[in-house]
Amino acid sequence: NEKWFALTDDDSLPEGILDDYTREIYNPEGELCGSHLIDTNSGNKERGICSIPYVRHSDGETVYFPSNLIENLFLSNGMSAGNNFAEAKVQCLSEIFERAVKRQIIEQEIVLPDVPEDVLNKYPGIVAGINGLEEQGFPVVVKDASLGGQFPVMCVTLMNPKTGGVFASFGAHPSFEVALERSLTELLQGRSFEGLNDVPKPTFNSMAVSEPENFVEHFIDSTGVISWRFFSAKHDYDFVEWDFSGSNEEETASLFGILESLGKEAYIAEFSDLGTACRILVPDYSEVYPVEDLIWDNTNKALNFREDILNLHRLSEDQLADLVERLEQSELDNYIDIITLIGIEFDENTVWGQLTILELKLLIYLALGDLEAAMELVEAFLQYNDNTIVERGLFYQAMHATLEVALSDDLEIEDYIHSFTRMFGQETMDAVVGSINGDVMFYGLTETSMKLEGLDRHLRLIESYKKLHTARAKKAGL
């Protein structure tokens, strides 16, 4: 049910994409171009902008949202399955409120009221879970995050006295008990007690808690920073023992009513191909990334690099020089991994899977014989290396030592090659020396192309996508 909109000659937004309300949000200054909305997966500029139909909640009208806009701003926020559409919508809206209210609390450094002990005692299972955490040495604070009964949101915050770190977990649901239970279970979801040693320390630095990247960290795994003000004894709201519960239909109506009271419009897509599921977008409320990213940090920047990077082994010297120059001029963070940059899934246990922009530029400079530029990046790699492939670290240690000799006027590689080989091994030194003299190109990177040879992980994704399309076509009688 996707619809494609051809690009216009002047690159303005094509008619039929978005509505007036959303255009005001996503294109307030008229700077958003059609080319900004080419989807990253297909990269099909000739076909245009891939868009998905959503139903506007207020009047049932269909509005087309570019898939690029959704992937750039909303990530997975507001998606859920359920036994029926009403139940799925309750879960979608609960998730949206959880994250939006959490963001508001963290960014505005709002002080929440504690949940009274007599209220907590109504839920012995939850109290037992809290006591279990405290017995492990983690003080727990339970707070009402409804902002005076406005929203169905709770918060359970864990402190780690061993590290000084704090982990604030939020949960949302029309039922007070379910929201509280979700807040508690979220604390340890996907992490062990040892994992709680990595949670960040609170701060009085308002800039640190309010920057957009901090919210992204909270969205991904709740490891963003929160303010010390969060723990003030002077709370900004009184405790409310709220209750929005009812039938699925009643809960859905209540949650949509909250959005309406905020002046927000919701857009809904329902899916029944593999069970009952839906997605809800609430523009200017449920985005994870800032709207400016559509212009300044769009994922479709991958289209500027994908083909050249996948064809790396077949590029001429001029093409390599052009590629590395474009990477430098892009001012992209050196530590962005290539998986993220070009939108291709590699096996994470391979060199491709852990390759960053920094290492790619380093290998290109070696291939071009620019040893000084390569040396600078080798030093950066060794200083900030997160690569878990041990052999890769040793390769660059050996490369650093060998480049120091190669770039010196006083040293000769023949005087050191024996010792280097004893230290790093024959295979590694053959790769290092070969990379420096041009006999070895892009050491560790297996050759591939736009046909994705050898990239089984991405090919499996494509195969799954084809199966889904086949099933949907069969269901539609096509």
Question: What are the language-model segments listed below?
Answer:
Residues 1-478:
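Helix-biased "structured C-terminal domain" signature
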